[in-house]
Amino acid sequence: MLTAEDKKLIQQIWGKLGGAEEEIGADALWRMFHSYPSTKTYFPHFDLSQGSDQIRGHGKKVVAALSNAIKNLDNLSQALSELSNLHAYNLRVDPVNFKFLSQCLQVSLATRLGKEYSPEVHSAVDKFMSAVASVLAEKYR
């Protein structure tokens, strides 16, 4: 459960990305594909090289979905409902992959933000990403 302080930290840190959202999303995906090679199976048509247009484009979509979730922290289920349906019913993505992406996104954020990615921010982002993963996996039950 996200506390009021967690929500505040998440919104603040997201606001500091300053137009680097696509870059962070692409970096997180690239890290995921290389740290967890099994995730590549969902993207057989993608050029999975670092910085490819396809990774950048999908990274932008991932970050846009997370931005929408951050705007709707009190109603994540509704904010992510369509995305949950897509991943569960159409794409049939194994829910463990949401955790993999979460870990890689946190590394990308920490790398980008340096000291601003404090232990408190890390904890808040980890809770947020766990909540997102949980909501995305709801339709699998």
Swiss-Prot record:
CDD domains to which the protein is assigned, alphabetical:
Hb-alpha-like
- From the UniProt annotation, give the residues forming the signal peptide: none
Q: Which InterPro entries match?
A: Globin, Globin-like_sf, Globin/Proto, Hemoglobin_a-typ, Hemoglobin_oxygen_transport, Hemoglobin_pi
One Pfam family hit: Globin
Listed as disulfide-bonded, the cysteine pairs are none
Which PANTHER family does the entry mention? HEMOGLOBIN FAMILY MEMBER, HEMOGLOBIN SUBUNIT ZETA
Outline the subunit composition: Heterotetramer of two alpha-D chains and two beta chains.
Q: What does this protein do?
A: Involved in oxygen transport from the lung to the various peripheral tissues.
Q: What is this protein called?
A: Hemoglobin subunit alpha-D
Source species: Passer montanus (Eurasian tree sparrow)
